[in-house]
Amino acid sequence: MVNLTSTELERYRRQIILPGFGQEAQQRLKSATVLVTGVGGLGGTAALYLAIAGVGRLILVRGGELRLDDMNRQILMSDDWVGKPRVFKAKKRLEDINPDVEVEAIFDYVTPDNVDSLIQSADVALDCAHNFGERDLLNAACVRWRKPMVEAAMDGMDAYLTTIIPGVTPCLSCLFPEKPEWDRRGFGVLGAVSGTLACLTALEAMKLITGFSQPLSSELLTMNLHQLTFAKRRSYRDRNCPVCGTHSQHYPHPQQLSRVLVNSQ
């Protein structure tokens, strides 16, 4: 396991002293690579909290330029960057905030051509993509390569969060065999709502990496931020799921040799 420098020991001291966390959990964070798809109010904020927590390597994937109407929730962006690729600004900001973190910026969307290489490069994936086309690609690739994925999405004042562990929990296709009605661009959102969900998303990733606490395993967390109500419901695998079911072409994959950084017990 990688060693921590004296600077890192001081930088992360307040989380290292958490009961049950310690230096070993911090070393696991430093050793980890996390893929973040979507660098918006959700993905960008989650990436920020992973960077300041000491995750060793982040892979950011997002095509498209920053728009002015993104700015109510883009805490890594600045006004002078409107019209430019947001993923490069995010990389620069994260490296400025924590120079010990390696950040790779990929100016592209998740596609059938790149999804497998992206997933194979990471230990954990954060699904913060802005449409279900990309989400479905990520889900299938994570199932193929046995990589855990934190799944987070929101619509207005509602949000959901779950952690997908291939072979253990339901996959995204089990949970949403049909596209939810909120799968559309241009929905209204408050920055504080996306930020709330982003923090929980980053926390789930840290749980997976460190084993410090139990992630949402086979549970779907739903949030109504109008009323500040949170509910968890049990979720179940669908044996007939086209992605992770018994006869799926995606699972099991003959090359599923990648390690999963999770204590699923």
From Swiss-Prot:
GO terms for molecular function: nucleotidyltransferase activity; thiosulfate-cyanide sulfurtransferase activity; ubiquitin-like modifier activating enzyme activity. Belongs to the HesA/MoeB/ThiF family. PANTHER family: ADENYLYLTRANSFERASE AND SULFURTRANSFERASE MOCS3, UBIQUITIN-ACTIVATING ENZYME E1. Signal peptide: none annotated. Keywords: Nitrogen fixation. GO terms for cellular component: cytoplasm. The keyword Iron-sulfur does not apply. This is Protein HesA, vegetative. The keyword Iron does not apply. The gene is hesA2. One of its GO terms (biological process) is nitrogen fixation. Disulfide bonds: none annotated.
